[in-house]
Amino acid sequence: MQGTDNAPPGAQANKSSSPRRIRHVRRHYTSNDHRHTPSTAESNPVQRIRSGEECTVELSMSPGQPLVEEQPLVEERPPVEEQPLVEEQPLVEEQPLVEEQPLVEEQPLVEGQPLVEEQPLVEGQPPVEGQPLVEEQPLVEGQPLVEGQPLVEGQPLVEGQPLVGGQPLVGGQPLVEGQPLVEGQPPVKVQPLVEGQPLGNMVSLYDQLPRGSILSLQKGLTLAGVTTPVDMPPLAGVILLCAVLPLASVIPPASATPFAAVIPPAAVIPLPGFLPLGRLLHLADLLLRAGVLLLAGILPLAGAPPLAGVPPLAVALPLAGAPPLAGVPPLAGAPPLAGALPRAGVLRRAGVLRRAGVLRRAGVLRRAGVLRRAGVLRRAGVLRRAGVLRRAGVLRRAGVLRRADVLRRADVVLLAGVQQLADVQRLADVQRLADVQRLADVQRLADVQRLVCVTPLSVVSPLAAVIPAVAVIPVVAVIRVAAVIMLEKMQPQGSSPQLQMGCRRIRQRRSSPRTCQKLRQERDRAGISWREHVGRHMLCSSTRSRYCSHRLGAACRSHCRLRCGVLCLPHALTQPTRQERGVAEMMSTS
């Protein structure tokens, strides 16, 4: 089969003038086993498409090949060259560097955050994150840096001494630890103290003190119970008093001078109420300037707690212009101050040193990882502190538990003691019951003896023939028969229901004094005489079942107490209490 190549010319002209059109390729199956071989013009449909003519390509497909109908060509896709380039995207190289940011452990890097290089690094002090450096603050070894504390002009840099704002520096005045610097006051020449020199020869020190302070001091020492020799000045007494009294657990007042921080006034004079505080502080200042504190090298003040940040007196800075004391070692690593530095020199030297290398050193060390090390140390300290607190809490809980265990053990011991006492009490009660039983048996034998003695001969004579049989009868049976015979003769004709009700109450519960009074009133209403009452109780103790259910012993004894306050005949041999004897006397007289 061939395509339609011989089309009319008009139709070809119309189709050639129209835009390029591509007809879909039609394919169909042929029944022949061979494929159709087209001519050269037919075999190149691309040339026909370029020439503008319409062509239809018919291809023969073999059996079993899938049919793909109307598949368009992909020539209408625009070329990839028309895609714009991504040259307009800004480069990341223009992003500012974050080198100025300090390396803080666990802190994210924020873009644009400046590096804080103004914080000085003090040896032995952990750096604090985010704390700015104050240029006016001196660098003191071992002293924490307080943010915002200015450097006061004229203040000397003393190792370990806190900086107080507004304190002037006087040129030429020696720097004494703990001594306030007063502007315009000349330094006091101090007489050196030689070991072994008597204190009474210190006339110059005695003359330097004002007369009023000496008299007040002498009066205070006298009232405090400290007596000084006549030829010894009061200043020597103060020195001896400072050497003898321990200076411990004394808190100086907030408004006290630096002398009060070294030796509190309460330690110099035991009774500070005898001297005004202002005069006492003034006297302390004078004693400091006179060189009393230099005695610390000869007579150490035992027990004095050192002030926070202030070295002890034994290693104090030597005074300028005064020979060092014997036995006082100089401060290790601190040159003696020949004189006070001028104000301008102090400020210039401090500022130059601080600005020259502190900032660079701080930045280099911080970048090298000081803050990371500080964070590790801080975290280790927190863990140690948490462990100590946890261990302390566990110990406290363990102490509480141990204390609770001790209390429980004490309770158990007390309960055991009470139990033992109760057991002893029961044993004593059993012993008393046994004793009462023996006494009751003896009493019965005595009663039988009396009955035998008072029996008429007419009654005894018929029994003379049966004496062997009577001897065989048990003694207990004879006692019971005799008691029943005797008590039935004494028993009244009828029994009172009120008396029976009272006995029933006694069986049911323990009676109080109020119940005892009610029972006495019932006995009085029933009209029972004292003899009948005793007879009834004898019957109760002998038969054990007629008037009460109590057995013979302590129960019957308590029954007799509650009933009338007097023991019945079986218990007559026991020792009654004082109250029972009083009630018995009262009942016998009535």
From Swiss-Prot:
Gene that this sequence comes from: OAM
Region (11 X 6 AA tandem repeats of approximate R-R-A-[GD]-V-[LV]): 348-413
Organism encoding this protein: Ascaris suum
Region (8 X 6 AA approximate tandem repeats of P-L-A-[GV]-[AV]-[PL]), start-end ranges: 300-347
Repeat found in the keyword field: yes
Sequence repeat copies, ranges: 66-71, 72-77, 78-83, 84-89, 90-95, 96-101, 102-107, 108-113, 114-119, 120-125, 126-131, 132-137, 138-143, 144-149, 150-155, 156-161, 162-167, 168-173, 174-179, 180-185, 300-305, 306-311, 312-317, 318-323, 324-329, 330-335, 336-341, 342-347, 348-353, 354-359, 360-365, 366-371, 372-377, 378-383, 384-389, 390-395, 396-401, 402-407, 408-413, 419-424, 425-430, 431-436, 437-442, 443-448, 449-454
Record-given protein name: Ovarian abundant message protein
Keywords linked to the UniProt accession: Repeat
Location of the region described as Disordered in the Swiss-Prot/TrEMBL record: 1-71
Compositionally biased spans, kind Basic residues: 18-29
Segments of this protein annotated with the region 6 X 6 AA approximate tandem repeats of Q-[QR]-L-A-D-V: 419-454
Entry keyword annotation includes Signal: no
Stretches for region 20 X 6 AA tandem repeats of P-[LP]-V-[EG]-[EG]-[QR]: 66-185
